[in-house]
Amino acid sequence: MNQHISFSNYSDDKNFKNLFTSNEIFDEQINETNKILFRIPSDFLHIDNLILTYDGQNLFDSSTSHFGTIFDLENILRTIEDEFGKNFLIIGITSNEKRHIQYNPYPKENEINHAETHIKNIVLNFLPSVLNYLNISLENTNQIVAGASMGGLMSIKTSILFPQFRNIISLSPAFWFGYPSVLNDVKNLSNESSTYLYTGKKEGHIFGDHVKNIFPNNWDLDFSNNDDFYFSGVKNIKDSFDSNNKKVIFSSQDNGRHNETSWATAILEILGQLI
């Protein structure tokens, strides 16, 4: 990838005064584009925590989110920064209409792994472009990778490929993509990694039809209803962490749904634990 990456203020709106955006970056493999969004703390001479995150358009601005709901991450970060005195640089990569292939680290054997290519582009090209623009380094910075749904799979895979991202936040990972490949991949995580794994218990609404009519019934999952199916899949990921002696901190919400509102509640708690 030899594309020029440039940055500008995200908006003239004062609510986004510390948010910046890149030009569109073309992914020739899938004929689609991504953008880089980054949020700077008030003092960025030293960065305590970097969070590299997927679906960046859902973090700060409701007008760009897929479903009109956002993490409202700026308020979450200010709460954490004020309480703990540790700052955060957020680098979010936007997704696109081919998210289902760009965010699937476990394609069929005869298919190109566009997700791995995307992750490598992000870490080897997108991330350095932000650091160069800000003229900062990540020396003594806690490097975190985060994502939700398919982004939850991407966060795990990112740490496998680039173990400097020792802290992983995986929210409601979409385990059924290539299942059970993610279970088998957990063993490839660094033993120094820590994964904060979350799911809600009311996430089955995303499937539309009953899961027994969608997925192979011989999967070792709970097909009694869609909510239990989702929970059982994420629980199997947690069990794979345990059986492979990888550190995992698992949490759930009884009424948690598959949306940014529930994930925002979860990530506030996770960040409080993480730092």
Regions found by a protein language model. Name each.
Residues A266-I275:
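Catalytic active-site module of serine/aspartate enzymes centered on a nucleophile-bearing elbow/loop
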Residues M1-N49, G85-F88:
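A domain-start/cap signature at the N-terminus of enzymes
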Residues Q57-K120:
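Active-site machinery of serine-nucleophile hydrolases
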Residues H46-L59:
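Short beta-strand element of the alpha/beta-hydrolase
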Residues W176-N255:
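The feature captures the conserved acid-bearing segment of alpha/beta-hydrolase catalytic domains
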Residues R257-A264:
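Catalytic histidine-centered segment of alpha/beta-hydrolase-like enzymes
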Residues E139-N191:
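Primarily recognizes the serine-hydrolase "nucleophile elbow" in alpha/beta-hydrolase
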Residues P105-S149:
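Gly/Ser-rich "nucleophile elbow"/oxyanion-hole loop immediately N-terminal to the catalytic nucleophile
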